[in-house]
């Protein structure tokens, strides 16, 4: 066979050189090839084997090439995963059904789940059962959702950006309502484009790419591959350890549901990515609207340390008020406007610097938002220059923001005082809830995602509170005949 002769001819010089240099014959395999020249039948078998191996190698190389090409195209278009994940997410449903749920799953460690009370639900239910309460209705998960939650992933359903304790009277009127965070964005259109573009420049520049309608917001492939390479390199040299591959979607999962709001292992990062991807494809393969919601949720949910008298600070809106005394509505109005005077430009530069500094402080809030603002000021100045170079902001905004420093509030703004008489009934209800649910404080109780209905009549309670608040007015007391035996003994010194 021509192929066998060709192989033998090619190996002959090599075999001679091998024996000359090494002082011993080649391995039996090569010797076999050499001897195959003399045996026609073996020569034919060898040729057939060579052809078969060559064909296998060609097919394997072609398959690898096709797989590589397919992987690149899928990374660019996300067509396949958007189809599969949206169908999978569509099977993860739940519905309210009478009585306790047979497959209830509760979160355990996430800061969001702890704050809103979801992680404590088993304890709450047990405590209320001991007081004679019973579950009237509870959500029953579909088999797919139950399996997904049972394997430790986070629920793919829309979650509240704002929640708190709400109490109603017998007619459905609000007695008490606590909303945390207090200042939030209710939709994408409320956010100034300047804030959106700045956030994307810092965290996830291609998130809102409208040309890629099926984009998976849970992973940015270039950063992901780079992060994997850096992680592998770090196993050889720890100094080569680079940054992560977090996107806005996975960061939301992290500071809401991951234990202590951190990513401690690769397994936790995978859990964040899968959960974020399923949530993004919940409404179908087209994720553009879901990606806009991610921007809204991130701005409302990012954690920015805490302050005495204010508590934990969640979201850009509350952070502007707590750290700088700036109202979110005013900030939105000014950042959306076109400055027409030096004063308005200066104010826009001031507010933009505050917003930018908060977006940067999210990386290490306790460090950057400490009394010494030097590191945060320096980081903000660097980003102002980079943002202007990238044409995210105008040079005029950059210069106006460079010209100011971050304000320092000695004390965080406090909630407005409420008359004790007006709070008497609601405080009694809240105290009863503290005892029934075994919650530590009003602070924790008011941050639960909890709604309660009472037998109190609000008009009557309001009238009683009004009368009690005026008992220090002599004319009011005398006009209502409240002076006398077993009443007020005198109208003097009522105050």
Language-model segment annotations:
Residues 56-59, 64-82, 86, 93-97, ...:
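Non-catalytic, structured segments within soluble enzyme domains
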Residues 190-231:
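Active/ligand-binding-proximal structured segments within catalytic/core domains
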Residues 133, 162, 168-173, 180, ...:
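Solvent-exposed coil/turn segments that connect beta secondary-structure elements
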Residues 174-207, 271-286:
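Export/targeting segments at the very N-terminus of extracytoplasmic proteins
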Residues 160-176, 191, 480-495:
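A short, well-structured edge-of-sheet supersecondary motif
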Residues 152-157, 459-494:
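Beta-lactamase-like hydrolase cores
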